[in-house]
Amino acid sequence: MSGWRKIYYKLLNLPLKLLVKSKVIPADPVVELGLDPSRPILYVLPYNSQADLLTLRAKCLALGLPDPSQSFEFNGVELPSHVFINDGPRVFRYYVPKQKSVKLFHDYLDLHRANPDLDVQMVPVSVMFGRSPGREGHTQAAPHLRLLNGIEKFFAVLWLGRDSFVRFSSPVSLRYMATEHGTDKTIAHKLARVARMHFSRQRLAAVGPRLPVRQELFNKLLDSKAIKKAVDDEARSKKISHEKAQQNAIALMEEIAADFSYEAVRLSDRVLSWTWNRLYQGINVHNAERVRQLAQDGHGIVYVPCHRSHMDYLLLSYVLYHQGLVPPHIAAGINLNFWPAGPIFRRLGAFFIRRTFKGNKLYSTIFREYLGELFARGYSVEYFMEGGRSRTGRLLDPKTGTLAMTIQAMLRGGTRPITLVPIYVGYEHVMEVGTYAKELRGAVKEKEGFMQMVRGLRKLRNLGQGYVNFGEPLPLTTYLNQHVPQWRDAIDPIEAQRPSWLTPTVQDISMDIMVRINNSAAANAMNLCSTALLASRQRSLTREQMHEQLDCYLQLLRQVPYHKDITAPKKTADELLEHALGMNKFEVEKDSIGDIIILPREQAVLMTYYRNNIQHLLILPSLIASIVIHHRRITLAEVVRQITLIYPLLQAELFLHYSNEQLPRVLETLANELTRQELLCSRDGQLAINPPRIRTLQLLSAGVRETLQRYAITLSLLCANPEINRGTLEKESRNMAQRLSVLHGINAPEFFDKAVFSTLVATLRTEGYITDSAEAAQGDIVTIYNILGDLITPEVRLTIESASSSTEMEASTSSSQTAEETTQG
C-alpha cells in the first residue's frame, strides 16, 4: 500500500470510527461459514466504495481475518486482497462489468493453474448502510454522477452509520473453480456475473420489496373479484346499499392491514437494542443461515414460531432484523389492537386477526385476499399456528385456519415458492407465567389493555437468556408434489379453492410443523434446574445431588441428542446451577454439611412451565428409568414392548418425531447411555438398577410420573366403563385429576388441563382403542392400564381405581334409573 493511500485511509477512518457501528452477519463467520483465517482470502464487494472497504477492514481485523487492504503475495506475484465488482451508478443505466474485476479474477485463476497447492477463499461481502425499501410509486432513480454518489454515501454514513451491517457469504474455493471449470477469461467473466446476481438477491433479502401505499393497496383489494362478490353478498344479506357494504369492507381493511414503516423499525431497533441489553443476558440464535439462504433464493417465507409470550412479536422481528433479513408482516391477535400498542405494532408490520371468522363472510374474504396479496408481493409473513400463548409451556394443538389460507394463496397460481420456517422460542423467564398459572386454575383471562401493559413492563427485569432456534424449513411446493401430486389442478387465480384434499393436508402439515418446532428446542439452565427440583417430592436437593442430576441431563442431551437441531448448554453443571441461582427463583439453605437448593412452594407451580418446555427431550429416558425402577430387573425387549404400547399417547401429546420403526433403536441407544452413566447395570441380558446411583435414576424417572398418572386415570375409567362417551370421558378424567392433585399434592396446574385430556382421548380414538360408537377395545385398554398401573405408586393407583369404581357405580345407577323411567313411561 502506497504512503498516500495509507494517509487517505487514516483520514477516512477517523469519521468512520465515530459514525459507524456495524453488525457482522453471521455473528461468527469463521465458525458458521467455515472461513479459514490461515488461508488467503479474496474479498468480493459489490460497489467501489472506500467507506465500505474500511468498514469491512475494521471487522476483519476484529475477527482475526486477513486484512482486505493488504496485498496478497505468492511466489513473487502480488495481487489485491479485495475486488469491487462494479464502479457504482453510471451515466448509462445498463450494467457494464468492471474490467478490472474480471482481470483480477483471471489473474487469481491463472495463479491457481500455475500453483496446484494454492487455494484462495473467495468471500462475497456486502456492506449496507440503511435498509429502506422505499414505497411503491415513488421514483428513486439512481444518481448519475460519481460525485453525487459520494455525497449520498457521506449522508448515508452520517445518518445510518449505526444501522449498518457487514454480511459475509459462504466462501468459494478458487482451487475448486480452477480445477473444475478452468482458468480462462470466460470463467472470470462468469464469476463477475454470478457475483453481481448474488449481491442483487442478497440486497432484496435484506431490504425486501417496496412497501405499498396503503390506500392503493385497499383499492386493489376492492377491485378483486372475490371481494366484489363478498361486498355484493353483504349488501344483499344485510339489506344495505352497495356503498355502505363497501364502507364496511374498507373499515375491515383498516382493522386488518399493517402500515409498515422502515423508520419505525429503525427506531424500534434502537429502543429494543437498549432494552434487550438491560433485560436479557444474551439472545442466542441458531440456524439462521438456512433462512438467509431461503430469502436469497427467492422463497416466500412464512415464519411459524411457538407462542410463549407477547414478547415473541418483538423478539423475533428484532432477531430477524439483526440477521440481515426483512422483519415480517405478523398476524397478531385483535386483542393487541389497543392504544398505544396497536398503532406501534401496526407500524412494525403487525396485521390483526380476529379469533374467529365464523358468520362473517366479508371479513374472511378480505383477510384471505389480504394475506394472498402479501405473498404475491413477496413479503415474508409470520403467524402463530397455536393460535394463542401456551399456558403450560408445552406446544398447543395447532389451529389450521391461517395455514389453509396460505395454501389457498398458492392455489391462486403465484410463481414464488412458499416455505414454512418453524421457530422454537425459549426464555429463562416469561413475564406472564404467573398469570398463566392463575388461568389454568380457573381465573378469567384479563383483557389486554394499556394498564395491563404498564403492569407487565414493571415485571421486566432479570430475564436471563433468550433463545431463537430456526427449525428445518418445509417447502410447501415440495410437500404438495410428494403428498398431493394433483394439487395444481385446483389452481384458480380468481376464486378461493377448497379441494377435498385441503383439510387433511393442512392438518398433516400443521402437525409436522409442531414436530419440527420441538425438534429445534433449546435446553437452558432454568428448565434443567426446574426439571431436577420438581422431580424431588420435597422440591429440594443438596448441591451435590443437583450437580449429579444436571450432569445426567447434560450427558443425555449431548451423547444421545433428541434431534440434530436441538441446542444444549455448553456450560458445566456447576456453571448452570450458579446461573440459575442468579435468577432468584430458588433459595439456598446452608447447614453444617453443605448447601441445600430449595424450590419455594409458591415458585413450584410457575417452574412447571419451564420444565414443560423441554419435557419432550427427556421423556423417553425418564420412561426407561421408571420401568426399570418398578420392575427391578427387566429385559430390553420387554422395555421396548411396554414403551411401544404407550408411545402413541406420548407422541401425540408432546409432538415427538420418532416413528414406530425408529423407536426400538432409539430406546436401545438410550438404555446404553444410561448404562454408560452407571445409572443402570446390564446383567445376563437384563437391565437392572445400580444401587449407588439410584437417587439420580429416581429423579430422572420422575420426569414422566405425572404424565403416566394422567394416562392411568383415563384408561382406568375406560376399563370400568367401556361404553363411556368421549365428552364424559374427558370431563370425568379432569375431575379425577383434580381430586388426585389435592389428595397427593401434585402441584402442577396442567395436570388437569382440558386440552391435555382432549388430546389424550382423541389419540385413543385415532389408535382404535375407542370408537365413535362409544365402545372401547377392552383387552387392549386393560393391557396398557396394567403397564401404567405398575409404573405409578400403589397409593395413587388405589385412589384412581377407587374413584373409577365410584364413577362406574354412578353410571350404572343412572342407566338403571333411565331404563326404569322409560319402562314406566
UniProtKB/Swiss-Prot annotation:
Annotated spans, Disordered: 802-825
EC number(s) stated in the UniProt entry for this protein: 2.3.1.15
Q: What pathway annotation does it carry? A: Phospholipid metabolism; CDP-diacylglycerol biosynthesis; CDP-diacylglycerol from sn-glycerol 3-phosphate: step 1/3
BP GO terms, sorted: CDP-diacylglycerol biosynthetic process; fatty acid metabolic process
Q: What reaction is this protein's catalytic activity? A: sn-glycerol 3-phosphate + an acyl-CoA = a 1-acyl-sn-glycero-3-phosphate + CoA
Q: What class of enzyme is it?
A: transferase
Q: Does the keyword Disulfide bond apply?
A: no
> Which UniProt keywords are listed?
Acyltransferase, Cell inner membrane, Cell membrane, Lipid biosynthesis, Lipid metabolism, Membrane, Phospholipid biosynthesis, Phospholipid metabolism, Transferase
CDD domains per the record? LPLAT_DHAPAT-like
User: Membrane topology type, per the record?
Assistant: Peripheral membrane protein
Which molecular-function annotation in GO is an example for this chain? glycerol-3-phosphate O-acyltransferase activity
SUPFAM superfamilies hit by this protein: Glycerol-3-phosphate (1)-acyltransferase
Location in the cell: Cell inner membrane
Where is the major localization of this protein?
A: membrane
Does the entry feature the keyword Membrane, yes or no? yes
The UniProt annotation puts motif HXXXXD motif at 306-311
Report the GO terms under cellular component.
plasma membrane
Free-text domain note: The HXXXXD motif is essential for acyltransferase activity and may constitute the binding site for the phosphate moiety of the glycerol-3-phosphate.
Q: Which family does it belong to?
A: Belongs to the GPAT/DAPAT family.
- The name on file for this protein is Glycerol-3-phosphate acyltransferase
Species for this entry = Pectobacterium atrosepticum (strain SCRI 1043 / ATCC BAA-672) (Erwinia carotovora subsp. atroseptica)
* Gene designation per UniProt: plsB
